[in-house]
């Protein structure tokens, strides 16, 4: 775990949960998940690059979580993980910046555009949407589409080990090869945990 459990935050967090359940009694215990982290002074954020990544991650962080490891369908929160990946791809020269890609990245985050996210996922993975594929080409397509998952796993953060970040985001839902990739029971949908989001 990247944060240290803290008694004070535990007490406050449990109080927030109890207050929430008191106000919303029909909210089941398994319908909420929280991860809350605190960077104590001197906070290592907004340093303008003064800290190396190693120094940043060695700074102690206090935290609290309730069901922080439960996998949850993230809707548009997944776009933050695609933002991380596309910046890594650009920084490492794995893709080239273009005006359209810059516009898509901006719209993906600022407007939460699903259409923009579709282009970003295409660029990240070298795949495109379309009709169903025969088994052989579909296996290749699936392997390529999982490249963001492999990148996230390579970071070695335990909080990212159970997440799934390989699907585009949709307004009306997927069709063709995208729908087949979701799985018959939607078992391959994007999934995050609150701990993973907090770590990011």
Each model region followed by its residue ranges:
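Surface-exposed beta-strand edges and their flanking turn/coil or helix-capping segments
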Residues: 47-49, 81, 175
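Active-site SXXK
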Residues: 72-95, 108
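Buried hydrophobic packing segments
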Residues: 82-86, 120, 197-200
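Short, conserved catalytic-motif segment at the N-terminal edge
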Residues: 30, 37-71, 87, 91
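Active-site-adjacent helix/loop patches that line small-molecule binding or acyl-intermediate pockets
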Residues: 4-38, 100-195
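A generic structural signal for ordered alpha-helices
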Residues: 12, 56-64, 83-86, 98, ...
């Amino acid at each position: 775990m990247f944060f240290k459990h803290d008694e004070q935050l535990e007490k406050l967090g449990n109080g927030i949960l109890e207050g929430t359940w008191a106000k919303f009694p029909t909210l089941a215990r398994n319908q909420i998940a929280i991860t809350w982290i605190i960077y104590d002074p001197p906070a290592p954020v907004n340093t303008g690059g003064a800290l190396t990544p190693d120094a940043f991650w060695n700074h102690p962080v206090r935290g609290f979580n309730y069901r922080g490891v439960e996998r949850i369908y993230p809707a548009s929160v997944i776009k933050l993980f695609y933002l991380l990946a596309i910046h890594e791809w650009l920084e490492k020269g794995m893709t080239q910046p273009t005006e359209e890609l810059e516009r898509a990245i901006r719209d993906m985050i600022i407007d939460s555009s699903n259409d923009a996210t579709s282009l970003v996922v295409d660029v990240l993975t070298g795949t495109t949407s379309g009709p169903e594929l025969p088994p052989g080409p579909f296996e290749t397509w699936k392997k390529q589409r999982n490249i963001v998952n492999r990148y996230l796993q390579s970071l070695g953060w335990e909080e990212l080990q159970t997440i799934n970040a390989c699907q585009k985001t949709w307004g009306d839902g997927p069709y063709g090869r995208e729908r087949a990739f979701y799985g018959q029971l939607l078992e391959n949908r994007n999934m995050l945990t609150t701990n993973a989001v907090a770590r990011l």
